[in-house]
């Protein structure tokens, strides 16, 4: 199984111990360095962490940015959208979701973290089924949600 992630971190380590290949695209250089150090410390060899910096002030054309488009060259069974949160006045994850829907193969899944911010995507998608998982937020007060879209 192959996983593609917008964003990197704990999920990169989680998937790397469970699947054949993880490709993670990270936009923040400092975070990229921290995750890369953690992967090396744990001797992870099946994760490809790539740094693709982006200018979030130019968001109106963000869907054509190298960050979003990095998914185009990757085959994945699972696509995780978990990056660029609270980084811009624009909703960036829905742009990543739109491209992910064109790239996901039949039988694949898209995971959208912090989906409580993007509930409109639960009705506007081409998934066969959507499962919503709610739980107390580990890093914020209140309940958070993660949506899993099955194709």
What name fits each language-model region?
Residues 1-58:
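SAM cofactor-binding core of SAM-dependent methyltransferases
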Residues 69-78:
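A short acidic, Gly/Pro-enriched loop at the edge of an enzyme's catalytic core
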